[in-house]
Amino acid sequence: MEMKKIYPRTGDRQIVYLRDVITNPNIEVGEYTIYNDFIHDPRDFEKNNVLYHYPINGDKLKIGKFCSIACGAKFLFTSGNHSMKSLSTYTFPIFFDEWELDKKDICTAWDNKGDTVIGNDVWIGYEAVIMSGVKIGDGAIIGTRAVVTKDVPPYTIVGGVPAKPIRKRFDDATIEKLESVCWWNWGEEKIKRNIAAIQSGDITALENAD
């Protein structure tokens, strides 16, 4: 379904459908993904939550469908990563005028980590930080104020600084079935008919959905 409204709840201006407030072509968001912010205007997600995301790098933030992103969650991109390969972490190439350097070499000031990819049905907790280049699998949960520096497998709960796995949400067989069903790709009407199954802990009910 094509979204036609920013706010999913009547009278609630703290939650937005994130896809409908994004203007940056290097940020891709799936349907029904929501962002909640009770401190700032949630429509300012690009400015307040996606940091060091400079066009010169071409790296992207890709967020899947039906994700829930809590207030203050941050996505830190490549330009925030000073190069650790050189003998100094100082970003000389950024100040090319001052040091009479070639502007085209500006990207050598940092280590390029690539795209940041968030799967479908991911819950990112309050003030969590997702570092550049991280891949988070479908159904994962990122704990409050966790700092995620490494990839997170599907349906895994992580927390802490740096974030470490706490446990899997389900056994491997159930996770495999969930990844096969991919309910988030169903049409709106099928989802409506099967919300009870989606909210249950019964994978068989989900597999048998019509």
Locations of regions flagged by a protein language model:
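N-terminal capping/interface segment
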Residues: 1-19
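Hydrophobic transmembrane alpha-helix bundles
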Residues: 4, 70-72, 175
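Structural signal for interior beta-strand "rungs" in well-ordered beta-sheet cores
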Residues: 15-82, 93-98, 105-165
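Core FKBP-type peptidyl-prolyl cis-trans isomerase
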Residues: 84-86
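C-terminal segments of enzyme domains that contribute to small-molecule binding surfaces
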Residues: 93, 100-130, 162-210
